[in-house]
Amino acid sequence: MLTKLFLKKKFEEYYSKNEVELPRKFKNREFAFVPLELLPDFVMHRHISFRSETDFRAYILSNVPAHIYFSSAYYERPAEDKMENKGWLGADLIFDIDADHLPVKAQSFEKALEMAKREIKKLTAVLRADFGIRDMKIYFSGGRGYHVHVHDEEFLSLGSAERREIVDYLRLNSPKIVVEDRFANSNAAKRVLNYLRKKLEEDERLTSKLKIKPADLKKEKLTKKVIRAVEKFDYSALSIYIDAPVTADVKRLIRLPGSLHGKTGLRVTEVEDIESFNPLKDALAFGDEAVVVKVARKLNLSIGDFSGKIYPGRVKLPEYAAVFLICRGDASYDS
């Protein structure tokens, strides 16, 4: 109980002192909240809308949330309980890269964030180069990954089927590169072929290994040698491991920028420069005032300016580190 009271006080202080970034056309969005006081039960209160920023701030200060979400969709009546009565008007295109969904599992929180960063860089490069997307924002999720919000008008009206095609293109789900003796005419196949052609042009050793040349990939009718080479080439480095259901869902709830992630105490933070961004420094929401916590097991922790081993028992930590461990369930508040 003491730990929850401490956490509620800290979250309330954060929201009283900091502005939270309301989404575009927020009056047409559904909001959802997980009350902190109900933790560890994850109880979501949803189908909520706001007419003003003042109303929103009053709500979160009187109902301190552990998590805040908003809908990717725009609605005529966002507060309606039944989805079919909301009046769907369109939805932002959302991408979620979470370290938990990557094929290689990280051994630490820090490594997970590094892996997610590499993946988000691949994603945004393809979105710009292949889709011509310019109006998008990158956010650190507050957890183990990143979100991309695309606001380009031409994507707003896409249904789930069209969004799944984008997922297939990015993840290369069964691209069917070769059909009989010709290259498939799908966007995913073209993406793979462009990648292979570029690799062949860059690396003569690959040309020798596969026994084909870049020009062979431009021929209308393919030889068996070219087909075999294309089909056995490893394209895994080209696949981007986005969370498919998030992108395909036209009514998805996504974390609100500027809000706190209840399982880390980190802030959902806009990323201006992905190269230099360090979530364990740049997404800290709390100060460095000393807080005493009780730790149950030996830990290695690197966050903010703190780095080192932590042993079981009473430990004095900077506030941001204490909140992080408490939210993750690795420590309890000890007054």
Curated annotation (Swiss-Prot):
The keyword Nucleotidyltransferase applies. Its EC number is 2.7.7.-. One of its GO terms (cellular component) is primosome complex. Keywords: DNA replication, DNA-directed RNA polymerase, Magnesium, Manganese, Metal-binding, Nucleotidyltransferase, Primosome, Transcription, Transferase. The active site is at D96, D98, D243. Its cofactor is Mg(2+); Mn(2+). It comes from the Archaea. InterPro entries: DNA_primase_S, DNA_primase_ssu_euk/arc, DNA_primase_ssu_PriS. Catalytic subunit of DNA primase, an RNA polymerase that catalyzes the synthesis of short RNA molecules used as primers for DNA polymerase during DNA replication. The small subunit contains the primase catalytic core and has DNA synthesis activity on its own. Binding to the large subunit stabilizes and modulates the activity, increasing the rate of DNA synthesis while decreasing the length of the DNA fragments, and conferring RNA synthesis capability. The DNA polymerase activity may enable DNA primase to also catalyze primer extension after primer synthesis. May also play a role in DNA repair. HAMAP family: DNA_primase_sml_arc. This is DNA primase small subunit PriS. It comes from Archaeoglobus fulgidus (strain ATCC 49558 / DSM 4304 / JCM 9628 / NBRC 100126 / VC-16). The lineage of its organism: Archaea, Methanobacteriati, Methanobacteriota, Archaeoglobi, Archaeoglobales.
